Amino acid sequence: MATNKSIKSVVICVLILGLVLEQVQVEGKSCCKNTTGRNCYNACRFAGGSRPVCATACGCKIISGPTCPRDYPKLNLLPESGEPNVTEYCTIGCRTSVCDNMDNVSRGQEMKFDMGLCSNACARFCNDGEVIQSVEA
C-alpha cells in the first residue's frame, strides 16, 4: 500500500515538473526590465494570455536570441541573466512546492529515496538540464 502512494507521489512530481518545464521554455524567450514586470508576465501567461499581449501589458520584450537587451535584464531565465541566486531560489522553490508535498503524504525509507529523486529532479530542472549529484546519503 505504501508503495502505491510512493509511486503516485513520484508520478505527480514528474507531471508537475513537466508542466513547469513547459512554462520555462516559453518564459526563456522574454525579457523584462525588473522583477515586477517578470511576475506580471508570468501571471499573465499562467492565466492564459498570449506572449505578445502579456509582454506588452507588463513592459517586457519577446526576443529570438539567447540574451536580453541591456535595458531589459531581469529574470530572463538564461545563464547570462545576471541573477546569481536565480538557480538557488528556483531549486528551493521547487523542493518546497513539489518535494515537501510528497513528504507530507507518507514517511518511511521509500519516501526518503523518492525525496532524493525529487530533489535531484528539481536541481536538474533549475540548472537547465545539467546533472547535479545529490550529497544526501
Swiss-Prot record:
Q: Which residues form the propeptide?
A: 75-137
Q: Which PROSITE patterns match?
A: THIONIN (PS00271)
Q: Which InterPro entries match?
A: Thionin, Thionin-like_sf
Q: Does the keyword Kinase apply?
A: no
> What is any Pfam family matched here?
Thionin
First-listed, main subcellular location of the protein, grouped into a coarse class:
secreted
Q: Name one GO biological process term.
A: defense response
**Span of the signal peptide:** 1-28
List the residue ranges forming a coiled coil, or say none.
none
**Location in the cell:** Secreted
The disulfide bonds in this chain are 31-68, 32-60, 40-58, 44-54
Which GO molecular function annotations are given, in alphabetical order? toxin activity
Give the CC-aspect GO terms. extracellular region
Q: Which UniProt keywords apply?
A: Disulfide bond, Plant defense, Secreted, Signal, Toxin
Q: Which family does it belong to?
A: Belongs to the plant thionin (TC 1.C.44) family. 4 C-C subfamily.
Question: What functional role does this protein have?
Answer: Thionins are small plant proteins which are toxic to animal cells. They seem to exert their toxic effect at the level of the cell membrane. Their precise function is not known.
Name used for this protein in its record: Thionin BTH7
Source species, please? Answer: Hordeum vulgare (Barley)
